[in-house]
């Protein structure tokens, strides 16, 4: 959600920001709609004053026994006009919808660009392994090991689903435990277990609605399956006014995520890279405005630490204006090396949304200044640490052996009680 006063005071700056996001100039239209709304509000206040004055006159006339029928009729007429005007204002002349449909303003540090091709590499980590045998993609390895079944998943649920069994199922569980233990015990995040169904308001608050209505799965009673734990963890502070000294707040959750993947037909149709259902460990931070840039770098380092301990090569890229998410003001992607594809693939995205989400959900913080309470919107940040399906795929491809087994990274062995992933028994 955008600050209308900022737009009115900085129309050229706002238009430049929207143009960098690939949109047309919007400031003039927003200012005109705001002016229309203010005119309607002025009319409404005037009608209410008239009605209040007549109501007082009616009271006096009744007390004196005088005829007040004409005043009563006028009052009824005004009440009807007020009701109609309130309804017009509620419809808002399209102002609120427009403000809610426009993406966040990019931070000054964000490079201009139209697509992922314009993202800027910040750093890379780790040595890419050299293989003395033909590299197999993770989905081939999984089926060879009898531990990954796409055929049965398709029979049950359709395309873009998978079934893991045996040691791969244990790897999923072990990865979640490894990540959560690290985030909570070493980096101070509070673990949260939450519902997988949320209402439209929760989705709106984080910017998933109204723009991305078709990207989520909706139930028959108008609930939605969570596309990411960000929805729930960020909404934990909706409609609050927190003391600034209580910040930052840091939450983490392991959950199933559900996405329709609208617009991705033909992309990554095999394997675990792009699925309708996947699991993820999410990080969310709530800060004040002065802390959010530092918190973003901290969050990014936490996500990187997962990959460092798994000894997976990766790189960090700063997203350009044309590739950032709707609610983000600045985003870093972490891309893990996938040997079978011979390229890096996104495994995490860490974003600072600044006050964009907080304005939508009414999340503020306050401090006392000479006994006066000063409030401002909080800043919200979110990041994946990490997407488990892609982490499993990366481990399988980077740690594969010539005999088809997978070496388990040292950091995971205490969670797996094994050194290798070996062939299992096929499902019936």
Swiss-Prot record:
Predominant localisation class: cytoplasm
Gene Ontology biological-process annotations: selenocysteine biosynthetic process; seryl-tRNA aminoacylation
Pfam families named among the record's database cross-references: Seryl_tRNA_N, tRNA-synt_2b
Annotated binding of ATP, by residue: 259-261, 346-349
Superkingdom, natural source: Bacteria
Compartments it resides in: Cytoplasm
Key words, A-Z: Aminoacyl-tRNA synthetase, ATP-binding, Cytoplasm, Ligase, Nucleotide-binding, Protein biosynthesis
Domain writeup: Consists of two distinct domains, a catalytic core and a N-terminal extension that is involved in tRNA binding.
Name of the protein: Serine--tRNA ligase
Source organism (scientific name): Anaplasma phagocytophilum (strain HZ)
